[in-house]
Amino acid sequence: MASEAHAVVDAHSPPKTTTVWVTGGAGFIGSWLVMRLLERGYNVHATVRDPENQKKVKHLLELPKADTNLTLWKADLAVEGSFDEAIQGCQGVFHVATPMDFESKDPENEVIKPTVRGMLSIIESCAKANTVKRLVFTSSAGTLDVQEDQKLFYDETSWSDLDFIYAKKMTGWMYFVSKILAEKAAMEEARKNNIDFISIIPPLVVGPFITSTFPPSLITALSLITAHYGIIKQGQYVHLDDLCEAHIFLYEHPKAEGRFICSSHHAIIYDVAKMVRQKWPEYYVPTEFKGIDKDLALVSFSSKKLMDIKFQFKHTLEDMYKGAIETCRQKQLLPFSTRSTADNGKDKEAIPISTENYSSGKENAPVANCTGKFTNGEI
């Protein structure tokens, strides 16, 4: 296993009057970001699909300072101008939400175009408000490395191959396309409107969470335990808290511009499996993975640009899994042991995950690209 850094974030304090807007505020990434912003003293406008649905927003309303510093707004990426009201008075925007539907019969019109239109609609709303100085967009590692000839190193100059994606149409292809086109369109449109545009590119996001449902990115990360084997031959990882701290850091940093990869660790599946077996022996985790070479080369997503402006990651890969496992246990989304079935000599069966407790595929779903690696969607 390899890591980029382990330290603390040197964060800046925002002006007391700073108001920011977070799209997708009720989701896995969005809700943690809202929590950290409130802790910093920001006033937060968070848009969600249905502010009246207490089951979906309860975790936000219970956050410290939510009663004084948090306002929830109803908005829809597919509806032009639906963000105009929520953005009033905001100095910054964190665009986390994205439409996702891997089973769409018409991905071009149901996923790709709405994502791009939604991005441009947000920039238009920013321009109308005339108060927004910076927009931070949660992109995806799927914009970096989906290509026929895989490399061992990727940085912010890397872009996935659209022609290859359209030709192969691998699982999640419409998500990759939507993120690539939205990011590129936003760069140009933000420049025209004199808005600082920053995109932050996470790999698989793992860690504790405050949502009530099982984040699909953790279905991927914990597949070693649950036996929902979307096997990550080798993967790149970031702790949810590090990712959200990086969002705020980049928003506050006066010299931040352009794309930033936010990836702290990379590891092959055998190393991750060994760690989980050692730290959580109560779970049955395979020692062999058919068809996966133990000497598989590591692919690195470089966070050098982010660290060069003094951001430092503070969480280890073990921290990520500890936070995820403990939270899932607390919320009764994961059993405390899977040893009984395995110890009886039977093939391990997948742990049933209730659809009641599973965030829909439209929210933060893990996506396998053509090499068996995974990235995450965000909402």
UniProtKB/Swiss-Prot annotation:
EC number per UniProt: 1.1.1.219, 1.1.1.234
Tissue: Expressed in both leaf and hypocotyl tissues.
Annotated pathway: Pigment biosynthesis; anthocyanin biosynthesis
Name the record gives this protein: Dihydroflavonol 4-reductase
Reactions catalysed, as given in the entry: a (2R,3S,4S)-leucoanthocyanidin + NADP(+) = a (2R,3R)-dihydroflavonol + NADPH + H(+); (2S)-flavan-4-ol + NADP(+) = (2S)-flavanone + NADPH + H(+)
Native organism taxonomy: Eukaryota, Viridiplantae, Streptophyta, Embryophyta, Tracheophyta
GO BP annotations listed: anthocyanin-containing compound biosynthetic process
Residues that, per the record, bind NADP(+): 56, 175
Record function comment: Bifunctional enzyme involved in flavonoid metabolism.
Gene3D superfamilies assigned to the protein according to its UniProt record, in alphabetical order: NAD(P)-binding Rossmann-like Domain
